């Protein structure tokens, strides 16, 4: 049930009948103030201008041809030509009842697509740090949402699992006569990496051996491939622990690292040469793009193969786009990475399209995000200025949540208390990020994110638990409740019903734009509207049984919507708090 979409289609039909072009847009939006209705159509004036008509006169023509009697109880022309739409309470009751009985709360799957979502993407032989948090949780929320909308989602964890560093690591492991790579902890690997780099920089014989191992690895040498596989496996086991703690849906089967595309790179570069897109420049192969200019105003050169024959990230990203279209048969590919990679992605995809590897119908979308900052406004670091490990951040979240819950004199069992601590601790970190517009930087603040007030995980989780407590106080049979009639008479009931039916609008926006903060804002508004409804409209102490059951139905759909919405964000709920 997408009210905005339904109204847009019907008003556009009326606009076309009234003389507007088929390309017109009704521009239907939720109204900001009750006196302007529940929705407004703002596209009348632009269409009237094209036709050379008075906007208010054209608006009346649209109303004369508009079939909304079942949905709207009142339509009015306002100002220079806006159409205000007041929804019909009877229609609202019908749709609320339908949403309650539908497994997806009334959201229907439409236009199923195959969507590749590239997110998280940590490096092998290194531990995940806070810089991986945003891609991991934003990408996962969008993946969950698109699946909920009925799409076929392919998760692609584009891990950094190829390059010269593996030659160094294999050589150093051999030097240390360590045949137990599979038993090493990841922090050991990080130490090995530092030592390997030191040897590589200081010992030419070691460096030569490392370079030879890279060549052997790329050539398929069994020993080198086995050691490389161990390093990858150890890394991904540790990463999986982080994913599980974060309640992120990525698994080992979703790994599509750089190595996957490596066999494609020579033929792609050769093809770019044949097409005349890539030209030799000082021994390297370069694609010059007129669409991007360098400081001198000349076409910018993008290297696809280095002088020594090595390939670059751009070449890999071209191959990835080609693979996702040709092999995975995707309709869309979404990449969640730092804003600083925007130009790089644009250039790689421009070359991909120029080479004809994907058609215009294949959507390549860079869902960029800003940085996580400390309270000083600088990139989030440890007190000593080091990189914050993701596991350490999650440990601290649990520690702080433990203190918070222990301070609240709760009547919970130890198991219940631990579940609340885990849900609030991890949920707070995730929600604080997801509730911010992904394209902006945001300040990481423990006090704000763990607060039970404002747009935070604890507030949302408590709002859900509070509604659950209403049902714990009654013995109403769920079947009987669903069968009970719903009536909407009070303004608070009406406001809540409309907000509940706007769930799909928020969910569809997340799926289209990759913006989980829209869903967070919706859920926060819903929780606030329910709180106002609860204060002004007695439920268990309603004036009669019919009103009680009717309001319980609104409470039930609110509970289901909050739970489903938080689930799409990857935020756990608890039954008691």
Curated annotation (Swiss-Prot):
GO terms for molecular function: arginine-tRNA ligase activity; ATP binding. GO terms for biological process: arginyl-tRNA aminoacylation. Keywords: Aminoacyl-tRNA synthetase, ATP-binding, Cytoplasm, Ligase, Nucleotide-binding, Protein biosynthesis. A motif ('HIGH' region) lies at residues 122-132. It catalyses: tRNA(Arg) + L-arginine + ATP = L-arginyl-tRNA(Arg) + AMP + diphosphate. The keyword Ligase applies. It is an enzyme of class 6 (ligase). It comes from the Bacteria. Transmembrane segments: none annotated. One of its GO terms (cellular component) is cytoplasm. Its EC number is 6.1.1.19. It is found in: Cytoplasm. InterPro entries: aa-tRNA-synth_I_CS, Arg-tRNA-ligase, Arg-tRNA-synth_N, Arg-tRNA-synth_N_sf, ArgRS_core, DALR_anticod-bd, Rossmann-like_a/b/a_fold, tRNAsynth_Ia_anticodon-bd. Belongs to the class-I aminoacyl-tRNA synthetase family. NCBIfam families: argS. Monomer. This is Arginine--tRNA ligase. The lineage of its organism: Bacteria, Pseudomonadati, Pseudomonadota, Gammaproteobacteria, Pasteurellales.
């Amino acid at each position: 049930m997408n009210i905005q979409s339904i109204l847009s289609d019907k008003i556009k039909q009326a606009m076309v009948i009234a003389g507007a072009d088929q390309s017109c847009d009704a521009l239907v939006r939720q109204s900001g103030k009750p006196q302007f209705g529940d929705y407004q159509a703002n596209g009348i004036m632009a269409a009237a201008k094209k036709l050379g008509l008075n906007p208010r006169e054209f608006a009346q023509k649209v109303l004369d041809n508009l079939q909304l009697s079942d949905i709207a109880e009142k339509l009015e022309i306002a100002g220079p030509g806006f159409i205000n739409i007041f929804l019909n309470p009877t229609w609202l009751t019908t749709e609320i009842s339908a949403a309650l009985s539908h497994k997806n709360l009334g959201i229907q799957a439409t236009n199923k697509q195959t969507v590749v979502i590239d997110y998280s993407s940590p490096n092998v032989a290194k531990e995940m740090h806070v810089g991986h948090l945003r891609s991991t949780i934003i990408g996962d929320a969008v993946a969950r949402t698109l699946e909920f909308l009925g799409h076929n989602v392919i998760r692609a964890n584009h891990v950094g699992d190829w390059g010269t560093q593996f030659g160094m690591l294999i050589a150093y492991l051999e030097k240390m006569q360590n045949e137990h790579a599979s038993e090493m902890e990841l922090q050991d690997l990080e130490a090995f990496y530092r030592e390997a780099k030191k040897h590589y920089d200081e010992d030419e014989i070691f460096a030569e051996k490392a370079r030879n191992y890279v060549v052997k690895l790329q050539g398929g040498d069994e020993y080198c491939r086995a050691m490389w596989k161990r390093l990858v496996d150890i890394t991904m086991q540790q990463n999986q622990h982080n994913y599980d703690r974060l309640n992120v849906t990525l698994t080992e089967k979703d790994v599509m690292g750089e190595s996957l595309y490596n066999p494609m790179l020579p033929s792609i570069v050769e093809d770019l040469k044949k097409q005349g897109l890539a030209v030799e420049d000082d021994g390297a192969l370069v694609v010059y793009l007129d669409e991007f200019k360098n400081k001198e105003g000349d076409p910018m050169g993008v290297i696809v193969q280095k002088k020594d024959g090595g390939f670059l990230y751009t070449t890999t990203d071209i191959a990835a786009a080609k693979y996702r279209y040709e092999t995975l048969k995707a309709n869309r590919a979404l990449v969640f990475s730092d804003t600083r990679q925007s130009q790089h992605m644009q250039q790689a995809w421009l070359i991909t399209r120029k080479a004809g590897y994907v058609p215009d119908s294949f959507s390549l979308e860079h869902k960029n995000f800003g940085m996580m900052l400390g309270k000083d406004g600088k990139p989030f670091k440890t007190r000593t200025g080091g990189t914050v490990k993701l596991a350490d951040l999650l440990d601290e979240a649990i520690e702080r949540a433990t203190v918070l819950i222990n301070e609240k004199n709760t009547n919970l069992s130890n198991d219940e208390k631990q579940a609340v601590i885990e849900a609030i601790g991890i949920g707070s970190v995730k929600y604080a990020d997801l509730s911010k517009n992904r394209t902006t930087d945001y300040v990481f603040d423990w006090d704000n994110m763990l607060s039970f007030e404002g747009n935070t995980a604890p507030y949302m989780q408590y709002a859900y638990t509070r509604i659950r407590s209403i049902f714990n106080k009654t013995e109403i049979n769920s079947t009987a409740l669903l069968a009970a009639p719903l009536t909407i008479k009070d303004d608070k009931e009406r406001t809540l019903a409309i907000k509940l039916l706007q769930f799909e609008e928020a969910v569809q926006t997340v799926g289209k734009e990759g913006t989980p903060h829209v869903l967070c804002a919706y859920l926060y508004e819903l929780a606030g509207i329910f709180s106002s409804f609860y204060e002004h409209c007695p439920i268990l102490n309603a004036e009669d049984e019919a009103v009680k059951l009717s309001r319980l139905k609104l409470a039930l759909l609110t509970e289901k919507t909050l739970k489903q919405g938080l689930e799409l964000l990857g935020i756990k709920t608890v039954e008691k708090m």
